[in-house]
Every structure is written in C-alpha cells, then in structure tokens.
Amino acid sequence: FTRCVLGMVVTLEAPSAVSVGLCLVHVACDKRPWLEGLNVEMDWQMSGKPLLLYLDNAAEFKSEALRRGCEQHGIRLDYRPLGQPHYGGIVERIIGTAMQMIHDELPGTTFSNPDQRGDYDSENKAALTLRELERWLTLAVGTYHGSVHNGLLQPPAARWAEAVARVGVPAVVTRATAFLVDFLPIIRRTLTRTG
C-alpha cells in the first residue's frame, strides 16, 4: 500500500526464524536509537507492530516460531498462493529497486558490464564491514522513501504520512528483547536423571 521499507536486518547467516524475528523487531520498534548507533541523521518514522504479514512460502516464514510469535501478538499471517509468483511482485520489485540503487555505488561494484567498469579494480576496492553495509543500505532506504514512486505518483514516505493521518500510528513495541524472544525458535528437550 505505502511501498515503504518497514525494516531490515543485515546478516551473513542464511534466512531463518531468527533473522525473521530480528527483522520484525526492526519493523515494530522505534528506529531512532538504531539510527543514532549507525550515526545516520534521517527520519525513518515507519515503525509499529504489523496487523498482517503477507509472505511467500519460504521455510523461514512457515516456522513454528513465527506462527507462535504472531499468534501472541495478534499478527495475521497470509501466504502467497503456491505456483503464483506474480503475487510477490511488490516485494520483488522493491528488491530490484534497491539493487539498482546500490549496484553502481558500492565500493567494489562490477558495474553493469565490462565497458562501464573500464579500469576500475572491483576486487581490490570491495571492502565494507557489515556495519558499513547496514549504514549504506539505511541511507538508500531514506533516499527511496523520499523519492517519487512511479506506481504511487508520490514518495512512499508521503503515502505513509497520509495513512497515519487516516488510521493512526501503529503501536510501537518498546520492549524489543521481550518481543524478539516471542519469535525465537524453541528447542524441546527431555530431562532425565542423567541429564
């Protein structure tokens, strides 16, 4: 609806119930302390506990942890129909837009083709820490939120502001750790006399 990026998590780990939980914390909590930690001055007001998650059928979105956490917090889960990839167009489009925004600007880019790359030494210039990448992606999100979206004919941030004016601000989670714990996997063990 707003086309806003509500949250993200940068990790070297494969997608999992844990990374989904971390991303939901980022979605639901006030981003100002996190932005200060990244030393980024921008307004990312899009936050709050979602009422609905529209997901594809990846294993991390079918986890017991996600189902349990969403049930505890009144978040409805809605899955894309199997074999219907066009239902994921909005999410796939934002990923494509993000990749287009960052591809030619990140240190070590390979550019679109060898002619465009020229003498640029991609391999020796490719050096970012995860924190630097997270900061860079955050700035890209800020640019995206403030740029006119072709489908909306207005910036996503303006669409968010209109929605908030109409229906109010979503409830922001203030206890991030407690919220995260509700979305973490549980491992069940049988206790015996010997351990």
Regions found by a protein language model. Give the residues of each.
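Flexible loop/turn segments at secondary-structure boundaries
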Residues: 15-18, 60-63, 85-87, 151-152, ...
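C-terminal, beta-rich DNA-binding module of retroviral/retroelements integrases
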Residues: 135-195
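RNase H-like two-metal-ion nuclease catalytic core shared by retroviral integrases
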Residues: 55, 63-73, 78-121
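A generic secondary-structure signal for well-formed alpha-helical elements
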Residues: 27-35, 57, 73-77, 98, ...
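C-terminal or mid-to-C-terminal helical accessory/interaction module adjacent to the motor/catalytic core
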Residues: 121-132
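Short, conserved catalytic/metal-binding motifs centered on acidic residues
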Residues: 3, 53-56, 88, 144
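A short, conserved beta-strand element enriched in hydrophobic/aromatic residues
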Residues: 1-37, 50-51, 79-82
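Acidic/histidine-rich, metal-coordinating catalytic segments
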Residues: 36-61
